[in-house]
Amino acid sequence: MIFQIGIENNNEGYRSITWALEHPGCFSYGSNAETALTALPVAISDYADWIGLHEPSWVLGDQVELHVADTWTDYYIDKHFDRLPGSDYYLVDAWFQYDWKPLTGIDIERGDKLLAWSRADLLGVVQRLSATKLDQAYPGERWTINGILKHVSNAERWYMDRIGYPVNTNKNDVLENSFMRLEAIRKHFLDVLPRLEGLQKTIGVDGEFWSPRKVLRRALWHERDHTEHIRKLIGR
């Protein structure tokens, strides 16, 4: 099976991500493009198996042919949209040629399923944790687990705002309880998703390009990434 790949370098200033562009939620990391690309076949196999837990997988992960379609290097800009080195400024993340493509009906149908499975995985990891564990601080970590959950929902809210579908409340007003916040913002996301089918919409916001396809790609990556993040914290 042929996979169209996007390579994103300098992600968060220190790593590379390889994205299976036709399969949101499928990605791998590395210290550079080469190591990230080397890790991708295993990530594709795991992704196919993950889908297969729920229904016959539409991804064939045993015969993988990678075609690098696009490469991007993240960079920082200031409020004047000038590129500057250093992490004190806004980091512009990857915009691939593939992100221009409007979402199809199949993309929407599969995206809805992937979002449901990803959310079930996240909740399966955290739902039985005590309040103490949810609010436990971890050395070297920016957030508690509760903080990560709020970050996941706030990011999803932010993604939708990028393409002109904001949640109609202030971020701090969207339910203090992290589980209720996750549910409320995801409901908005799922309500909007069918309206994005076939929509030829690309918006530049704060120096970065966004489209419905990029939003779906980023939302699934972000939740799956932080689900693994939380698993690692619990295992400490």
Residue ranges with predicted function:
Residues 43, 71-72, 85-86, 185, ...:
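A general marker of short, structured functional hotspots
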Residues 87-105, 112-135, 154-163:
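A short mid-domain helix/strand-loop element embedded in enzyme catalytic domains
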Residues 101-128, 174-203, 210, 214-222:
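Acidic/histidine-rich alpha-helical segments that form the ligand environment
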